[in-house]
Amino acid sequence: NYKAEYRRLKQMKEMGVNAIRTTHNPASPQTLQIAAELGLLVQEEAFDTWYGGKKPYDYGRFFEKDATHPEARKGEKWSDYDLRTMVERDKNNPAVFMWSIGNEIGEADGKAHSLATVKRLVKVIKDVDKTRYVTMGADKFRFGDGSGGHEKIAEELDAVGFNYSEDNYKKLRAKHPNWLIYGSETSSATRTRGSYYRPEQELKHSNGPERHYEQSDYGNDRVNWGKTATDSWTFDRDNAGYAGQFIWTGTDYIGEPTPWHNQNHTPVKSSYFGIVDTAGIPKHDFYLYQSQWVSV
């Protein structure tokens, strides 16, 4: 629905947002048109999975299969065809400033198969559009000291996306001074609009019966792997070599009701991550970000 999408993106613009990431699939032409009209930059993301898959019936089933579409080129895999057509379709939209070839890809470990895959996907994009950065959202940098075979994958990219990896940023920045690093997915604070709980505490994955399936709108609830909105933004603000962040998420969505995710008894069906709820009404962190990003 064009009007609903316009309202949603306009609300992000009013909060002070200057860019959005399409997680974890290509955007509709209407979304990109609205973003261009509003002056929002877009990182357009092609895949949430490569050949390893994440669910039994996800795109991983087709990633390396030969493309059978009548417009597919000889020798193209489905991942080649889908990525190429996304870039061809949207390369003339002025809102698009980065292409993403994946999000939290478990098999992107720098071994021969994954290294060949990242090179193949980058080439597919560059053959169509050499003017924009190619990136991906990587969560492996958050484990241990952040090092590993995934660094080889990052070397093939124009911009290196860190998912929840702020704690290892300084070590990796010193190790890779030439990398363009940004937060491809950050925060994952959890909130219920109008519900308030223990403001003096920072609550990590708090899901006891006393919570009544609600998270605190004080901005003090978060997942184990994330940060509060305040801490996430403060890190971004205070590290000049960190090129901004994409917050998880702008609006609530159906599914992933963390911290009650995968608990079959839960009556909750939507996420708590959104800065705006499913009715389109802002939660309190909306005004935190607005106070930092908008001049009034």
Set out the residue ranges of the language-model regions:
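Extended substrate-binding grooves/exosites of carbohydrate-active enzymes
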Residues: 1-296
